Amino acid sequence: MDGLAIGGVSAPMTAERPQQVKKQLSRRTPDAADGRKPTRMERAKAWTPEIEDQFRLQNSGFKSLDEYVDMYGEPERWPNELGGFISKTQLKSNGYFVYWRKFRECEDKHLAQVKIYYYD
């Protein structure tokens, strides 16, 4: 076993790499898919299926369905006879999957957390 040696370069000891990754993720703006910025925002006051989908998207880090579609494509949904809600999303921050139930998850106590954005 002569002549065999382990060589190489050690990992960098600075925080340079995580900053580069953070910069790549932050290049993406929180605007709508076509670059529009929201002109106003309201909080949800009553539950609807649209509010449910918005709740699921916002818990994954997105402002709107347009923003999600631009990054990952159309989200998977439960069949219409089961409500047609979003069944699986990916997190905006790292791409991990989030699986959602077939029925309502946005309880009344969470309604005020849901933001409805309006674009002109």
Swiss-Prot record:
Q: Where is this region: Disordered?
A: 1-45
Q: Where is the composition biased (Basic and acidic residues)?
A: 28-45
Recorded GO cellular component terms are:
nucleus
Which Pfam family is one of this chain's hits? Meiosis_expr
- The cysteines covalently paired via disulfide bonds are none
UniProt xrefs under InterPro entries: Meiosis-expressed_gene_1
Q: Which family does it belong to?
A: Belongs to the MEIG1 family.
Q: Provide the protein name.
A: Meiosis expressed gene 1 protein homolog
